[in-house]
């Protein structure tokens, strides 16, 4: 579902490339639990990494202008920001040149990396047009509880790590239910079973040491007319 984008001059553009994509031994899947406010990267049914996240503070679903986080089966359609520095601000998926530190007062833009999602089911078919992303946020103190405008927010450190571990087209499952038991056990063992206290930035994700896939573009994405939610 997610297109992989080329890296050029610190800006990602979707285009063809002659570089081959490395193939992992098993397909990876992203599972996002609204109840747990966590994202698990799974491979062959086992967790590779577990990260705290923040989903919508408004609702769940795919209704236009609702600021809801969509549920169901999706995939990564685009990867944007490959060479951007930590805290790089994006507007309309383009870097502005501004860089923000974590928890910059009064600021809530999209930062660091963008994984643009597209839906695969009737109930999330508007996801791409609604500009729903997995992305970095400077509001890292809100990670671990619902606080977004529909997107799935991560710390800058965590979104870079996830970005580097998956190719475009990676399957995503967003569910109201809890993470798989193996991922919950992983998180408990690594001390990531609870949300951070108010005003605190969550600890970095605990990840397994596995090879990271090379990114490869899979062609341009057709432009859509869409509504752009403020600071998802």
Residue ranges and their predicted role:
Residues 18-20, 64-66, 84-232:
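Exported/periplasmic cell-wall-interacting domains
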Residues 18-60:
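A structural motif detector for short, solvent-exposed N-terminal "entry" segments of globular domains
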Residues 10-13:
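C-terminal motif of bacterial Sec signal peptides marking the signal peptidase cleavage site
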Residues 26, 47, 70, 109-111, ...:
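A short, polar/charged loop/turn motif at coil->beta-strand junctions and beta-hairpin connectors
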Residues 29-33, 38-40, 50-52, 75-77, ...:
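Soluble periplasmic/extracytoplasmic beta-strand elements of cell-envelope proteins
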Residues 1-2:
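Bacterial N-terminal signal peptides that target proteins for export
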Residues 52-84:
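Electropositive
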């Amino acid at each position: 579902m997610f297109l992989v984008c080329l890296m050029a001059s610190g800006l990602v553009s979707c285009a063809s490339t002659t570089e081959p994509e490395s193939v992992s031994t098993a397909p990876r899947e992203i599972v996002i639990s609204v109840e747990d406010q966590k994202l698990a990267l799974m491979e062959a049914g086992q967790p590779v990494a577990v990260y705290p996240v923040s989903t919508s503070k408004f609702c769940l679903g795919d209704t236009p202008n609702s600021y809801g986080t969509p549920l169901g089966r999706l995939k990564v359609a685009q990867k944007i920001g490959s060479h951007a520095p930590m805290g790089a601000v994006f507007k309309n998926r383009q870097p502005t040149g501004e860089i923000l530190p974590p928890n910059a007062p009064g600021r809530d833009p999209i930062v660091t990396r963008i994984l643009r999602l597209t839906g695969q089911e009737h109930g999330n078919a508007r996801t791409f047009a609604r500009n729903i992303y997995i992305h970095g946020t400077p509001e890292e103190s809100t990670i671990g509880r619902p606080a977004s405008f529909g997107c799935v927010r991560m710390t800058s450190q965590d979104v870079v790590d996830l970005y580097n571990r998956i190719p475009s087209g990676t399957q995503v499952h967003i569910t109201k239910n809890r993470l798989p038991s193996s991922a919950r056990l992983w998180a408990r063992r690594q001390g990531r079973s609870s949300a951070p206290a108010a005003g605190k930035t969550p600890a970095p994700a605990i990840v397994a040491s596995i090879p990271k896939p090379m990114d490869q573009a899979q062609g341009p994405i057709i432009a859509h007319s869409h509504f752009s939610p403020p600071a998802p």
